[in-house]
Every structure is written in structure tokens, then in C-alpha cells.
């Protein structure tokens, strides 16, 4: 099939990763993408929009007749790009962006069963005692609450007993008045007692609920850290965070609903039905149960029907928000192609859908409220008619009528919220589904049972790759039978073109991934056979993009060894050549580095990364293009720090700039996933037609064409670009909801 060309002039950019996912989903669609600058490569997947809705597409098409707009719409129509992935498992979304890795959902019964283990933990007898006390207080509150209508009944009967069918206080004896007064006081005590039991129940059960939420959230957090790197690379971190947040809030709501609403209401319904059956007869209980059943069935059915309108409303709201934010963030692009009218009409299309769905939501809510009132009124009227007949026949008193009326009206209050509670409980279970589905995900990188720790010293820290094959996607080999050895205490560099597998070697060595074939050894021990913690403790990494925590410089330095002393931190800062720069900062080591370290320059961030790697003090050090984004002056200073650091250590340098690894003991050149050349710098240069010599000459010719020295990369400009991308990401993440469910 002829490929669909998406030209650059249309202003439409798409990630390569997004393209690969599209090609996996539909083999009939092929696309070529162009990238105008580095920021375009890193745009979020949700910056593309689904415009396949015929009604929305036709309205937009009619109002925009510019050729550029039509090209964009035509491209989107054929590609069927999705705006975002829903994290609610029962709402048409999924936890995985990869269709080959769709996670199995956890049904509601398993969710409630798993939640019960946290509410009734075997190792916490204090929490179990609180649950028992809470249930006892619940029963006490409902029994006391049911006593209130009885107090009314006795008061009315006492005041009415001397006057027949007419209530006449002037003729009532003092004893009757005294008894009625006592009964009315009992009524007040009953109401007060019911409120007291309810509040005590809330106070006692609060610790159980919060402890359950904390333990579940902690377990999910630890589980996510134990999952393999492939899982995290295929997910949006913001979506994971929202999934955990929604799931924990869902747990809180379900516990509250079960303990404070659904459970008490069900108990009170059974209690009232039993009382009416015992005091008034089976027909009273039958009418009551029939009314409550019809009320519940109507509420559940209408609420389920209304949910679709709520979903449509939220989806349109999210789409309108995303469209507005994306349009404003791309203000210049809109101006370049005169598409202001197109953007406005597109935005208005989403608002029209929102308006229509909102009206449906409001009107169906009115219908729900009316239906509930009608059902309850019919049932209450039937009960009152039966009670009146009983009074006329002499089998019931006026007090019985008051009691029956009071019992039913007490039930009406929690029943009024049944629709809301049902809808929110249903949504909470969906949110919890996502949370517990995350817990059910199994990592691909598993540690063997009773695996011994890796035993390695700097003198024995050899690294050996033995016929290693690896592929991220089936059929696309990244490493194709790679074998090499790094002697202990030596510096070995790995170079090659983009996609040759350089960074993959670092990930395999750290066991972020497993090779499909072959073995990797450290100090003669297969890394598959040793404990993960000991393996990763023995290897230090200085990444290309040093990401720092939003905390102080001291915290980020100490992160290399959280048990280190302050003097140790200062020592490694001096070794990395950043100590003096820190002392010049306003708050010195207490200076906040900002989100991802954006308040520091690129060189400062790399020095912090080097310092904390020194503080870790591992026998093996890996440098993954640690200076590729820095200017030559900063790079030279950092390389000097690295030389001091790698003395007597086994070190592997993944390099893009060959000038940084000329002093390596051995250089390994990768080409198409294989070891193409090996040797030191001079040996490889002296080899006629070698890949290394070609790379060296190419890089030198670029430097010479730009002058005697390579032009420095303006760090502050790069920093501003990072800040801009960060701001854009935060704005996009601020759009709440997934649009595929009633969140």
C-alpha cells in the first residue's frame, strides 16, 4: 500500500514511538514523519487528537475551507490517532499503550476480597478490634435510631388513651402527661444516642480506613519500583500517578460507603421490615420491601443509563480543554497557517457536544429525582392506608400510624443518596480496578529464589558479554551475538552510530532487560544467578541526562549513599569539582535544584551525578554519553573529574564524541548490533578504512569547518528549552479526567 506522506508544511508532527504503535495496531496504515527540531521528538502522545467522529468532523470541515486545514484533517482521518489512553480498566481504556501487553482486569469480587485483607489484617489486632467496635457502634446507632419512632408512638398513645380517638390534653390525667413527657424525653435521648454512636463509629473506623489506604498505596508504590524498565517506558508517569491517586481515593470512598451508607441502610431496611412484620403484620412488611426494591431497582437502572451522558460530558470537556491548551501552546503555528477560525470552530465543536451532554445529564437527574419521590410516595401512601384501616378496625392505634410513618421517613434520607452512592461506588470500583491491576502486573526481570549476592571487589570486577542477542521488538535485533570482556580496573569505551546498541549494553548490565540469548558475567558470576540488589549496588551509572530530585543539592548528592555523613558528601563534591560552585550559591548545599534539576546548568547537573556516583563507591562505573550535551570547556573539566574517579576501577564509557575516550585502554566499535572493531585509539586510527577512523575524521572535519574549536552549546538556552517543555508538560497534565469514564 502506498505510504501516506505527512508533509512538514502541514504543521503536523508525530512521535516515532506513536508511529510504531499505530503500525502495530493496523498493518494497513503506513506513515512517514519528519521532525523539525528536538522538542518535536519528545512531544506527548496525547498532543494528537481523535477526529474520527463523523458529526464533529463534518461540522469542522464545513467551517474551514483552507487547504492547510483540510490536509491536516485528511491526515488525521486516515491515521485515526488517539488523544490519550484511559486508565480505567472497565471504561474502554487500558493500562498499556502496547496492544500486545493488555493487562487482565481484576473483577470487583477479587478487589473487595483483597481490600478485606487490608481492613482485617492478620498482623494488626488493634485494627481488628476497631472494626469490631465500629460494627457494634453501627448496630447500636441503627437500633437507637429505630427507637425514635417508637418513642413517638408511646407518646401519642399515652396522650390519647383517655380521650378515645380525639387528642385532648386538658382531660388527660397528670400521670398520662407525666408518662408522655418521659417518653418524649426518651425520644430526645434516642436521637442523641444515635448521633453519638454514629460519630464514635466514624472516629473509631477512621484509623482502619486510613491505615488500609496507606498500606495499599505503599505496596503499589514498591511494586511499581520493582517492575522492569520496559513497563515504565511504555507508560505515562502522570497517568500512573493519577491511577494510584484515584485508586486510593476509591478505596476511601468504598470503605465509607460500605461502613457509613450502604451497610447501615441495608441493616436498617431489614430491621424496619422485621419490626413491621412483627408489630403490624406481613402485608406491611411486604409493601415496605416492595417499595424499597422498586426504589432501588429504579435508581440503579436510571443511574446506569445516565452514566453514558456523564461520560460523554466529561469526554467532551477533556477534549475541549486539550484542544484549547494545545492550540494556545502552538500559538505561533496557528498564526503561520492562518488557522484561527479553524481552531475556534474545532474548539466550539467540543463545547457543543459538552452542552448537549450536560443538558441530558441535568434532565435525566430531574427524572431520577421525580421517579424516586413517586415510588416512595406510592409506598408510603399504601402503608398509611393500611394503618388507617387498622385503626378503624381497632387492631392499631394512632401511635402505630405515627411509628410506621416515622420508620419509613427515616429510611428515605439514606435512600435519597442511593443513586449518588451507587454511581460513585461503581466509579470507585473502576478506579480500584486500575490500582489492583497494577498490583497484578508481574515483572519480567525476576530474581531466582535464594539467589546469592554478587561478590565482587575492584580487583576482580571483570565484565564479560558472551554471545549476547537482544531485541526490544520481535524481529528487530539490537545486539546480534555481542561478545567482549572488560578486564578489572581497565577503562573500555563503546562507540558506534545511533541504534548500534551502545546504551542497550548499559541497560542489560544493570538488568533492566534480559537478553534473549547469551550470558553476562561480572567477576565470573552470571548476573541472572545473583541477587538484584547486590548487582545494582556493585554498578554505578552516570547517565547522559542527569535527572535530579526536586530537593536540595545536599539531598541529591547524598542520594548516592543515604547513610553517608556530611563530610563524605563534601568530599565527593570536591572530587567532582562542584564544591566551590555550591558555596557561591545563596543557600549553599541547601539550595533547591528545582524540578529535574532545572535550576542548575548542564555542567553542574553532571557534576552532581558524578559526585553521587563516587559516593556510591561501586567497583564498576558506567558512563552513558555523560558529556554529549555539554560545551567543550565544561566537558573537559568534567572529564578531568572522571579521570580521578575511575582510577583502579572497572569503567565502561558509552561515547558519542570520540575525543572523550582517546585515553581508553580499549575501544569497542559496534555496527548493526555486532562488534565490528576493537583496539586502542591509535591502533584503530592506523587501520585503513576502519569505522572508527571514519567516525574520527568525520567529527574532526565538522570541528574544522566551524573553526579551530567546536562552538560551545549555550547551556542557558538549553535550560530555557527544558523549562519550556516542562511547563508544557505540566499544562497538559493539568487536564483532569480520561474522557472514557465518569471520572
Swiss-Prot record:
Q: Where is the composition biased (Basic and acidic residues)?
A: 712-724
ABC transmembrane type-1 domain mapped to chain residues = 131-427
Q: Where in the cell is it found?
A: Mitochondrion inner membrane
Question: Which ranges does the record list as Mitochondrial intermembrane topological domains?
Answer: 153-168, 272-281, 386-400
What role is this protein assigned? Exports glutathione-coordinated iron-sulfur clusters such as [2Fe-2S]-(GS)4 cluster from the mitochondria to the cytosol in an ATP-dependent manner allowing the assembly of the cytosolic iron-sulfur (Fe/S) cluster-containing proteins and participates in iron homeostasis. May play a role in cadmium, zinc and mercury detoxification.
- Here the transit peptide covers 1-19
Binding-site residues, ATP: 472, 496-503
Annotated GO biological processes are:
cellular detoxification; detoxification of zinc ion; intracellular iron ion homeostasis; iron-sulfur cluster assembly; iron-sulfur cluster export from the mitochondrion; negative regulation of reactive oxygen species biosynthetic process; positive regulation of heme biosynthetic process; transmembrane transport
Bilayer topology term: Multi-pass membrane protein
**ABC transporter domain: which residues?**
463-697
Q: Which SUPFAM superfamilies match?
A: ABC transporter transmembrane region, P-loop containing nucleoside triphosphate hydrolases
Q: Which domain of life, per UniProt?
A: Eukaryota
Sequence similarity: Belongs to the ABC transporter superfamily. ABCB family. Heavy Metal importer (TC 3.A.1.210) subfamily.
What ranges are annotated Mitochondrial matrix (topological domains)?
Answer: 20-131, 190-250, 303-364, 422-743
Keywords of the record, alphabetical order, are: ATP-binding, Membrane, Mitochondrion, Mitochondrion inner membrane, Nucleotide-binding, Transit peptide, Transmembrane, Transmembrane helix, Transport
The answer to whether UniProt assigns keyword Cell division to this entry is: no
What is the official name of this protein in its record?
Iron-sulfur clusters transporter ABCB7, mitochondrial
Please give the catalytic activity noted in the UniProt record.
(glutathione)4[2Fe(III)-2S] cluster(in) + ATP + H2O = (glutathione)4[2Fe(III)-2S] cluster(out) + ADP + phosphate + H(+)
The residues the record assigns to binding glutathione are 306-310, 369-372, 419
Where is this chain primarily localised?
mitochondrion
Oligomeric form and interacting partners: Homodimer.
Identify the species of origin.
Danio rerio
